A protein has these predicted regions:
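Extreme N-terminal cap/leader segments of soluble proteins
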Residues: 1-2, 22
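Conserved C-terminal portion of the radical SAM core fold
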Residues: 143-158
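Catalytic alpha/beta core domains of metabolic enzymes, predominantly
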Residues: 159-187
Length: 187
């Protein structure tokens, strides 16, 4: 997966704004920050520089967040995660897409609360797969718990591209019937 350096991001941001077709842009998170570090860049300076043109244009920015692992590949203490949301919001990030590859709500719900405390929009994520146990009911019950915890948005994250259109459509209908004000995004 290609991830650009901060100098490339800063050059492309004004062009994205000029296109005039985006309400949201992913600006940082796990992979972005790891690439910054690999290039010897400061990810905190990078996110401030990259989000600035979007903030000025009124375009919301969002980051990817691995729940219990925050932006890393290993668990991060709760106090560090709580602080991370405050820092990211101060740096210009509006939305955090919180996911756990196992859909374990215990790994996602604390991050929803921390993001809300920091003034961010927590977009709780359902990682989609296809198997006999991964039914509409399975995913809808997880969505219910995440929404009850405060998530105003749900993302259906089909990382492997194996989500079945019929099942995904029914899942969206099921969530919207129970939670009509919740925004649902497919990724």
């Amino acid at each position: 997966k290609y991830q650009p350096r901060v100098d490339q991001l800063v050059r492309i941001a004004p062009l994205i704004v000029e296109m005039g077709c985006f309400a949201r842009v992913e600006t940082n998170g796990g992979a972005f920050e790891q690439v910054n570090l690999l290039y010897g860049e400061n990810p905190n300076k990078a996110v401030r520089a990259f989000t600035a043109p979007f903030r000025e244009a009124g375009i919301q920015t969002h980051m990817l967040d691995r729940g219990l692992n925050a932006l890393r590949m290993y668990p991060v203490p709760a106090d560090v995660r709580r602080l991370m949301y405050k820092v990211k919001h101060a740096q210009g990030v509006d939305i955090t897409r919180i996911f756990c590859g196992l859909n374990e709500t215990r790994n996602i719900i604390p991050s929803i609360k921390y993001a809300l405390e920091a003034g961010m929009i927590p977009q709780a994520t359902l990682c989609i797969t296809y198997s006999p146990v991964h039914t509409v009911e399975y995913y809808a019950s997880i969505a219910d718990r995440l929404i009850e915890a405060g998530a105003p948005e749900i993302c259906l994250k089909d990382m492997a591209g194996i989500g079945r259109p019929g099942m995904l459509g029914q899942l969206v209908r099921t969530i919207k019937e129970k939670h009509p004000d919740v925004l649902i995004q497919y990724h």
